[in-house]
Amino acid sequence: MAKKGSGYGPRGGDFRYNDEAVARLINAIMLDGKKVVATKIVYDAFDIIANKVEGGDALEVFRKAMGNVAPLVEVRSKRVGGATYQIPMEVPASRRTALAFRWIKQFAARRGGRSMAEKLAAELLDASNEQGASVKKRDEVHRMAEANKAFAHFRF
């Protein structure tokens, strides 16, 4: 008989904030296994945010930005009798955060000419204020789901 696996336990947080979401953001920013570089980018971005925000709480801005970017619904393709329908589906919590990290990283990298830490800080600040490209992406995904609401009865 197979041994019972340990399953998924709680992940460790990051060093400075001891927060699991910040650790996941660092992992999302990381390229080619260079975690020290990714950690420096994220912490520098948080320092920039702390200097720009009155209360100085970068973690609160980050959490608000994540909440504003994470999508509630998305469309999934399903083939029904020769036609492909875009079916709106609720997004599971783990995918919501993964999409939010992905979009924040993607649209921060597209911003013009400064360091990645400055671009990430600008994107997080914009996202916390319901602005920026990552929030537009979330709104676009929600609009697609709203437009295809008629096909919701085809759920998987």
UniProtKB/Swiss-Prot annotation:
CC per GO annotation: small ribosomal subunit
Gene Ontology terms for molecular function: rRNA binding; structural constituent of ribosome; tRNA binding
Pfam families per record: Ribosomal_S7
Top-level taxon of the source organism: Bacteria
Gene Ontology BP terms: translation
Keyword terms of this UniProt record: Ribonucleoprotein, Ribosomal protein, RNA-binding, rRNA-binding, tRNA-binding
InterPro entries in the record: Ribosomal_uS7 (IPR000235), Ribosomal_uS7_bac/org-type (IPR005717), Ribosomal_uS7_dom (IPR023798), Ribosomal_uS7_dom_sf (IPR036823)
Family named by the database record: Belongs to the universal ribosomal protein uS7 family.
Function: One of the primary rRNA binding proteins, it binds directly to 16S rRNA where it nucleates assembly of the head domain of the 30S subunit. Is located at the subunit interface close to the decoding center, probably blocks exit of the E-site tRNA.
Subunit composition and interactions: Part of the 30S ribosomal subunit. Contacts proteins S9 and S11.
Protein name: Small ribosomal subunit protein uS7
Source organism: Chlorobaculum tepidum (strain ATCC 49652 / DSM 12025 / NBRC 103806 / TLS)
Gene designation: rpsG
